[in-house]
Amino acid sequence: MLERIKDSFTHSIQTKIDASEALPESIAKAAEMMVHCLLGGNKILACGNGGSAGDAQHFSAELLNRFEVERPPLPAIALTTDTSTITAIANDYSYDEIFSKQILALGQPGDILLAISTSGHSGNVIKAIEAALSRDMTIVALTGKDGGPMAGLLSINDVEIRVPSNSTARIQEVHLLAIHCLCDNIDRTLFPQDEQQ
C-alpha cells in the first residue's frame, strides 16, 4: 500500500514534468485570450462533469473572488451549479443539453467557454462547444488522452490544453495546475501593480 501511494506521487510528478514541456505555450495563449475577453467587457463560461465540474467551479470562484492578489472581481460563470436549471433541461430535453441551452441563453460574441473533459468525449461538453461556436464565442478546452471529439471541433482561433497522459487522475491534477496558471497570468497581466514574488 505504501509503495502504491509513493508511485502515485511519482507518476503525478512525472506527468507534471511532461506537461511542463508540452503545455506552457497553450496555457499562455489561453490566458492571453481570456485577458482580451475580459478587457473587452466579456465573460468566461465554464463547464465539465464530475471532477471537471469541480474544476469549472474552482476556476469561476478564483475569478469572481480572487486568486493570490487583491483585485476587483472578474466575470466568470460555472454552468455546473444551478441544479434546478440542470435537472429541468435534463428531464425535459436530455443530459447532453444541460450546458448548451445555458450557453445559448447567456453566451455572447466575444465570450469564452472553458470546456473541461479528461477524455474529450463528454457529450454535453461537446454540445456546449457547438453552442458556443454558434454564438461566436472562443473555446479554451482542457483535455487529456487523445483529445477526443472535442479536439476536432476546435479551430485556429481556439486553444486546446491537452495533458500528455492517459490516466484520468493525473489529467485532473494537471488540469488544476493549468487553471491556477491561467488565473495567475490573468491577474498579473490585468493588475501588474499587484505583482508579488
Swiss-Prot record:
Keywords, comma-separated and alphabetical: Carbohydrate metabolism, Cytoplasm, Isomerase, Metal-binding, Zinc
Obligatory cofactor(s): Zn(2+)
Any one annotated GO CC term: cytoplasm
Q: Which GO terms describe its molecular function?
A: carbohydrate derivative binding; D-sedoheptulose 7-phosphate isomerase activity; zinc ion binding
Q: Does the keyword Hydrolase apply?
A: no
Q: What class of enzyme is it?
A: isomerase
Please state where this protein is localized: Cytoplasm
Instruction: Report whether DNA damage shows up as a keyword of the record.
Output: no
Q: Which Pfam families does the record match to this protein?
A: SIS_2
The catalysed reaction is: 2 D-sedoheptulose 7-phosphate = D-glycero-alpha-D-manno-heptose 7-phosphate + D-glycero-beta-D-manno-heptose 7-phosphate
The residues that hold Zn(2+) are: 58, 62, 172, 180
**Matching InterPro entries:** GmhA/DiaA, Phosphoheptose_Isoase, SIS_dom, SIS_dom_sf, SIS_GmhA/DiaA_subfam
How is the cofactor bound, as the UniProt entry phrases it? Binds 1 zinc ion per subunit.
Known function: Catalyzes the isomerization of sedoheptulose 7-phosphate in D-glycero-D-manno-heptose 7-phosphate.
Family recorded in the similarity comment: Belongs to the SIS family. GmhA subfamily.
Q: Which NCBIfam families match?
A: PRK13936.1 (NF010546)
Q: What is this protein called?
A: Phosphoheptose isomerase
Q: Origin organism of this chain?
A: Shewanella sediminis (strain HAW-EB3)
Identify the coding gene. Answer: gmhA
